Regions:
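Active-site recognition of the HExxH zinc-binding catalytic motif
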Residues: 84-101
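Metalloprotease/metallohydrolase-associated module, dominated by Zn2+-dependent proteases
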Residues: 2-81, 101-201
Length: 201
């Protein structure tokens, strides 16, 4: 299956329309108008170890009185399984929009989550096998895989450590690589006081 040709936001908009009309409405739940984006949550960790998969903001927090739903960019849609995970996160956040975050993850949230096929625990729901099959048939087969690879803020791990060099006389210090230390004269004079000798601290 190919990646969707839609932008990430257009994919989320079309997926939300399908979820709204074909999953939530038949179960008696009305999903309001929402704005959707891929973004880091305002709470929780960011990047590779992020525990915040998505976030829904109340209507009161938006200038136009519309719920804002964000999905973390740390999730990848490059596989069908990854796309299904993004869609079940979207469904979770849409439940919050249904009652404008009034119930948190309480009874009203749980009733809706179980009705559409999400599984416990409620703070970190996942799709049941039945919901995954529904998402695949009704969204993934129509729109393709979600057009996004995961993003991590953790970056590359540092492979070299700079070593501290210090003047025993005046306390001037700096850090440099092992290579630079190996190139220093046996006795290197301090750059700050000219009297002291630099030593590896």
């Amino acid at each position: 299956m190919k990646k969707s040709k839609l932008s990430r936001e257009n994919y989320l908009i079309q997926a939300t329309d399908i979820l709204r009309k074909s999953l939530f409405k038949p179960k008696g739940y009305k999903v309001p108008k929402v704005e959707l984006s891929i973004s880091w949550a305002t709470s929780g960790n960011r990047g590779k170890n992020s525990k915040t998969a998505g976030q829904c903001f109340s209507k009161a927090s938006h200038q136009n009185g519309i719920n804002q739903v964000i999905i973390s960019p740390s999730y990848s849609g490059s596989t069908i399984e990854g796309t299904l995970r993004i869609l079940d996160i979207l469904a979770h956040e849409l439940i919050h929009a249904v009652d404008d975050l009034k119930s948190g993850h309480g009874k009203a949230f749980k009733d809706c989550a179980l009705a559409i096929g999400l599984k416990s625990p409620m703070r970190s729901t996942t799709a049941s096998d039945e919901l995954n099959e529904w998402l695949r048939k009704n969204i993934v087969d129509k729109l393709g895989k979600f057009p996004h690879g995961s993003v991590s803020l953790s970056g590359k791990k540092q492979t070299t450590r700079n070593i501290k060099v210090e003047c025993y006389c005046c306390g001037f210090s700096f850090r440099t690589s092992r290579k630079n230390i190996d190139m220093m004269d046996e006795v290197s004079h301090c750059l700050a006081c000219d009297d002291g000798v630099l030593q590896v601290a």
